[in-house]
Amino acid sequence: MCIRDRLKHNEMLPRILSCTALILDIIILAVFFVSSRINADVDSMAYTDVTGINNKLAYQNHIIRLNNADDTFLVGVIMFDLNNLKRVNDTLGHEMGDRYIESFSAILAGVQNERISAYRIGGDEFCVILEKTNAVEIHQILDSLERKINVYNEKNNIKISYAKGYEISTREHYYLMEELTKRADSRMYENKRLMKGKRLDGRRLNV
């Protein structure tokens, strides 16, 4: 190699090293981005039910977080239990039963915002946890949910029916999460007993 070639080589070397470093930085950023997306997707799958709503693990984590908070003041819990699921499964098959659950899940998911989270915590059991809430807001949510269910039922042969019950932790009636969920659950089952015997209409679930 002649002196001129060596000089050119020496001049090019820093540029080559700079480009190599830039390429490595881009590769590292790309790997980090992909890894972050994969981790986010894994987390989402871990806390999402097959119906697309938050699952029981997400619910349990929310309960733990509220238990570890300074207080549960103005936390509300609404419990739901679908009626007639066994009848749908027995008469129309489990696929229709799954669609019955999915239809309710999709409607219930619509109540969510930064303070309100909806969960499927059992086969036909659902829960909504509200923070910084009050009885007026809960009744508004329940009324809105009922209107949406009524619209759905007008368009579909199998009618969604559900029992509900709620409780709020207030200054006058302060509850920790275990007692709060128990009281909401108890009111839901009281509502379910009142609705017992209600018959399933239609023969087909259209979604």
Predicted regions and their residues:
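Catalytic-core segments of nucleotide cyclases and related cyclic-nucleotide turnover enzymes
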Residues: 139-146, 150-154, 168-200, 205
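Short, small-residue-biased leader/transition segments that mark boundaries at the very start
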Residues: 1-3
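A short linear hydrophobic-aromatic micro-motif
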Residues: 114-118
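Conserved long alpha-helical elements within nucleotide-processing catalytic cores of c-di-GMP signaling
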Residues: 43-46, 54-76, 83-109, 119-123, ...
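PAS and PAS-like sensory/regulatory domains
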Residues: 158-163
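Short beta-strand-to-loop capping motifs
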Residues: 128-133, 168-170
